[in-house]
């Protein structure tokens, strides 16, 4: 099985070219199949069911071809990954037998689509002898992928598969369609609820996965009595507990201490914090002299010089609360304090006080 005419670099380059060409063809054929589905929906809406079935058979073949191209793409990737084995070993490695034989078998069937695939097959035949290549092309060696052979076969797709394609196309485009009851009755037991089975004749027996571009999938494998077991649910991952900060012991009372501080002493009440800020010194003096009339508050007052200091203190106290200045408050300071000189009120200039009072009112 040893050949002497292999060119390793040429084989490597063409394997990469085959992969790129296959990816482009898969994308192109998938887009064309999507457009063809819209045409089939129009046929169903117009009542042309037979014509729609013919078009669906063509779509199924294209989907099979896309799946076959995906399989070949994987085999080319495998050969590139193990290219060192191909170069170093004289005999064919058992792990590469299926990949090599499948590529040689598919080359004459897809060389019109992918011309580089024929070059790859010729290089592999040069490496492992022409006799080996002949055995692979006829599958006499028995290592060609059976699923790929099914996808590239010339047999017509099953009727039940055609009906399922039509049902799904009608559902996607909201077109009324009544499937053929005779064909649906011939479906194998246990597969009636399946959406689309792209090869339930061979692939279900082998359990091979469906990777087609037409939305196909593999039906579950049936038992000896023809029944299909229910699939086991996937184990759900355990949710991760999110991190959370510890909650506070209780809400706080803005008028006192936090709630719960004095629960052990029910007879003791926390001191209440006044809602208003503490006022200046003369408030107590004003409350102490409640019986003084308004005329006495304004009349007897100090000389013009002392009121300047209490006025500035009053302004500093109420700056943060945006309260207007009260002109009458500073006049009470000397009268409320004990031992104040009451005779000084005779020297007060009432005209001057009135003028200043009016000016203060205008400012506020």
Curated annotation (Swiss-Prot):
Disulfide bonds: none annotated. Residues 334-345 have a biased composition (Polar residues). It is found in: Cytoplasmic vesicle; Cytoplasm, Cytoskeleton, Microtubule organizing center, Centrosome; Midbody; Nucleus envelope. GO terms for cellular component: centrosome; cytoplasmic vesicle; midbody; nuclear envelope. One of its GO terms (biological process) is protein transport. The modification Phosphotyrosine is found at residue 43. Its main location: cytoplasm. Belongs to the IST1 family. ESCRT-III-like protein involved in cytokinesis, nuclear envelope reassembly and endosomal tubulation. Is required for efficient abscission during cytokinesis. Involved in recruiting VPS4A and/or VPS4B to the midbody of dividing cells. During late anaphase, involved in nuclear envelope reassembly and mitotic spindle disassembly together with the ESCRT-III complex: IST1 acts by mediating the recruitment of SPAST to the nuclear membrane, leading to microtubule severing. Recruited to the reforming nuclear envelope (NE) during anaphase by LEMD2. Interacts with CHMP1A, CHMP1B, VPS4A and VTA1. Interacts with SPAST, STAMBP, and USP8. May interact with VPS37B. May associate with the ESCRT-I complex. Interacts with MITD1, in competition with VSP4. Interacts with SPART (via MIT domain); leading to the recruitment of SPART to midbodies. Interacts with SPAST. This is IST1 homolog.
């Amino acid at each position: 099985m040893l050949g002497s005419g292999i060119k390793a670099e040429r084989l490597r380059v063409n394997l990469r070219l085959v992969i790129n060409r296959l990816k482009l063809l898969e994308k192109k054929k998938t887009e064309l199949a999507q457009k063809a589905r819209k045409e089939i929906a129009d046929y169903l809406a117009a009542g042309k069911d037979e014509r729609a079935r013919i078009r669906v058979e063509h779509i199924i073949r294209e989907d099979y071809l896309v799946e076959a191209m995906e399989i070949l793409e994987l085999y080319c990737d495998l050969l590139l990954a193990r290219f060192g084995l191909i170069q170093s070993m004289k005999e064919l490695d058992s792990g590469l037998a299926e990949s090599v034989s499948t590529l040689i078998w598919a080359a004459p069937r897809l060389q019109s689509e992918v011309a580089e695939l024929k070059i790859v097959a010729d290089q592999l035949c040069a490496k492992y002898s022409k006799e080996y290549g002949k055995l692979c092309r006829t599958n006499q060696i028995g290592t060609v992928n059976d699923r790929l052979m099914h996808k590239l076969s010339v047999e017509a797709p099953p009727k039940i598969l055609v009906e399922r394609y039509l049902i799904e196309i009608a559902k996607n485009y909201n077109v009324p369609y009544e499937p053929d009851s005779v064909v649906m009755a011939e479906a194998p037991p246990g597969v009636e609820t399946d959406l689309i089975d792209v090869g339930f004749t061979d692939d279900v027996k082998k359990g091979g996965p469906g990777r087609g571009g037409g939305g196909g999938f593999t039906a579950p494998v049936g038992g000896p009595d023809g029944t299909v077991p229910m699939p086991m649910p996937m184990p759900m991952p355990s949710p991760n507990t999110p991190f959370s900060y510890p909650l506070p012991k209780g809400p706080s009372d803005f008028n006192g201490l936090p709630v719960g501080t004095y629960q052990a002493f029910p007879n003791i009440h926390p001191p209440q914090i006044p809602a208003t800020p503490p006022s200046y010194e003369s408030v107590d003096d004003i409350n102490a002299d409640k019986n003084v009339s308004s005329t006495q508050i304004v009349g007897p007052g100090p000389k013009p010089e002392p009121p300047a200091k209490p006025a500035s203190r009053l302004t500093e106290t109420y700056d943060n609360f945006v309260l207007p200045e009260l002109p009458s408050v500073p006049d009470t300071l000397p009268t409320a304090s004990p031992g104040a000189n009451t005779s000084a009120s005779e020297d007060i200039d009432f005209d001057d006080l009135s003028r200043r009072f009016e000016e203060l009112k205008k400012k506020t």
